[in-house]
Amino acid sequence: MTDGRRIERTSIDPKLLELLACPVTKGPLKWDPAKNELISAKAGLAYPVRDGVPVMLPGEARPLEPDKPRR
């Protein structure tokens, strides 16, 4: 199911990616260009990137495992 937003492919500046950290674990993030998401493997969360802006709010993150609750 979709929330009505059109997915527009974007990219993340590698220097910005070096500065960003997961707000839950403070760990590194990995860019997933296919899904426009920043992945925190340690937290098991995927943060959306909308209009080129990372949305680093835990409440907006998608669990990587659908049955896993958000931290």
UniProtKB/Swiss-Prot annotation:
InterPro entries: Trm112-like
GO CC annotation terms, alphabetical: cytosol
Pfam families in UniProt: Trm112p
Domain of life, per lineage: Bacteria
Recorded family membership: Belongs to the UPF0434 family.
HAMAP family (UniProt xref): UPF0434
Protein name: UPF0434 protein Meso_3270
Organism expressing this protein natively: Chelativorans sp. (strain BNC1)
